[in-house]
Amino acid sequence: MNPMLTNNSQPSNYTAGNAKGKIKKLRSACDACHASKVRCSGEPICARCQRDNVACHYSYRAHQGKPKGSLNRKTIERMKAAGFIEQRQRPAASQPPGHGTSRDSSVCASGTTTDNLLNFIEIQPPGESNESPVAIHATPSPCFAMTGGLLPDFDAANLDAFLEAYQTPEDSCLRAVEEFPGASPADMDCIFIGTPSSMSRDYTEVATCRCVREITQQINNVHAASADRSTTGLDDVLHYTREISACISGLLQCYSCGGQVQVFVLASVVLSLLMELMHPLLDSSTDTSRPRAQIRVGNYDMSGQLGDVLEKVIVRSIITKLRQVVDKFEMKADFLRSETAQAEFLKSEARRLKRGFGRIEEGTATLP
């Protein structure tokens, strides 16, 4: 009897049953060859063990199969059909934009679907005003009398002081670009540079953002239109509603300035001005000099009373859209990283805007 053949040595095709009735098979390589990761002859005493004069032992195979929790092809297909795969991949797609994201993703863009009624109306943007913005003095109106007073004065000097006090991410990036060797104006949209002002915030690198400039421009435009409310027509209000709704919706989703209290104050100012601009639309008397809605069916002029009815229907649609924007404004104000007094002020402004838009909606409920 060969001394190297022990009782622990079994042929490679040896099988045994366990307590559960499953068949266990031995490895095709002995333990020594398996540990050394070399080819084994598979004999009861392999050539390598016989050459080295060591005991040749064959162990049972390890548990075969996929790791616990893995998915096979059919399971993945069923999950795709049920929509679970998309839900797993959705959080990864909703991460903040990286280095290659263009500025267009952070510019004020509409986050909500535009009302179908507003989409069917062709709007010509009002003429650009060359006049310098003057002080905005809110005048008494039924809406403000019932919703809590007048809007505070907000002139061009205050705007300049505000923009100097509030350093936008774009300004900080542009100043740092001057120290960047070989940087061209075309590269400013894709450069991310951390500055001391941005390092003090929760984020260290932010994309270039034009939200503050956009909403300041909207304030100037609405103020120029409200200088003579008697000449403001329905098309002007529709145009400003679309522009302001898109700007505020993009601002609330912006990673750079969406958590700044000053930006929310600007949003409440422009919404208040827009609400004041909508009040002349409630006057259906023929004595007013404002442009009336002109409706023509072929060669027949259907303006007048039918135009007033259509105006009020469109105004109600505008109010619905603006109230959705104010709801998002109020929800976002709860998560601001600011003092409690500032957050409460912004929420009170949101409630005031809701009441004001509600008064306008009640005024359009009675059709002539």
UniProtKB/Swiss-Prot annotation:
Keyword hit for Transcription: yes
Record bears the keyword Secreted: no
BP-aspect Gene Ontology terms: positive regulation of transcription by RNA polymerase II
Annotated compartments: Nucleus
Protein name: C6 finger domain transcription factor tcpZ
Alphabetized InterPro entries for the sequence: Stress_Response_Reg, Zn2-C6_fun-type_DNA-bd_sf, Zn2Cys6_DnaBD
Lineage of the organism: Eukaryota, Fungi, Dikarya, Ascomycota, Pezizomycotina
Entry superkingdom: Eukaryota
Major localisation: nucleus
Pfam families per record: Zn_clus
Protein task: Transcription factor that specifically regulates the thioclapurine biosynthesis gene cluster.
GO molecular-function term, one example from the UniProt record: zinc ion binding
Key words of the record: DNA-binding, Metal-binding, Nucleus, Transcription, Transcription regulation, Zinc
A GO term from the CC aspect: nucleus
DNA-binding region: 30-56
Stretches for region Disordered: 84-109
SUPFAM superfamilies for the chain: Zn2/Cys6 DNA-binding domain (SSF57701)
